[in-house]
Regions:
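Generic beta-strand structural signal
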Residues: 10, 19, 41, 49-51, ...
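Glycine- and acidic-residue-biased ligand/ion/polar-headgroup-sensing regions
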Residues: 7-26
Length: 111
């Protein structure tokens, strides 16, 4: 589910496999797409960046670095149009992540 960490940067390092990392604007449009583990070997996102990560390979592992102690995400830090993990529509949304490009928006999201 697309989310943000308002108070910390996030650094992603692929340990095994490849990962699609999508960044979004406040309205849910994709602003950036990176395949971590191909030509990109590390990705740092500023605090407050809306993003999601999808593993492209079975058994993929990514190392995340954030500042400070673990803080669970508040509902306000997840995109309301995206279903929570395990909810109806999750499989369709994850399939879309794999092919989505900058400028795209998830078709079934409320307008």
């Amino acid at each position: 589910r697309p989310h943000r960490h308002r108070h910390t940067f996030e650094l992603l390092l692929p340990l095994k496999g490849r990962f699609v990392v999508l960044n979004f604007d406040d309205h849910g449009a994709i602003t950036n797409r990176v395949v971590l583990g191909e030509t990109c070997t590390a990705l740092e996102m500023e605090a407050g960046t809306w993003h999601t990560v999808l593993s492209l390979d079975a058994g993929g592992m990514v190392f995340e670095v954030k500042q400070g102690a673990y803080q669970p995400l508040a509902e306000m830090d997840t995109m309301a149009w995206a279903p929570a993990e395990g909810q109806p529509g999750t499989a369709e949304m994850m399939a879309w992540y794999a092919i989505a490009q900058p400028g795209d928006r998830f078709l079934s999201m409320p307008q």
